[in-house]
From Swiss-Prot:
One of its GO terms (biological process) is translation. This is Small ribosomal subunit protein uS10. Involved in the binding of tRNA to the ribosomes. Signal peptide: none annotated.
Amino acid sequence: MNGQNIRIRLKAFDHRVLDASTKEIVSTAKRTGANVRGPIPLPTRIEKFTVNRSPHVDKKSREQFEMRTHKRLLDIVDPTPQTVDALMKLDLAAGVDVEIKL
């Protein structure tokens, strides 16, 4: 796989789970002899939702909820076939979304 890069983008709501998965991917890639660029922290997306506290009165009384989506970016430079096999067999946490581009 000469001259190819694998770009891995990870997303999760909990940054601790995301960082643990990132460390697992980096250690697996380094163990199989590939060079790793990153992890690069991407901007956190914050979605805020405002709702009324009461069902039908008191418009001024509101409550806000937020959802934070944390993201990381990894580049694996010149991966070996062993790297690709090891990454395919890797079992990550349930709350992590993984996007892979070749």
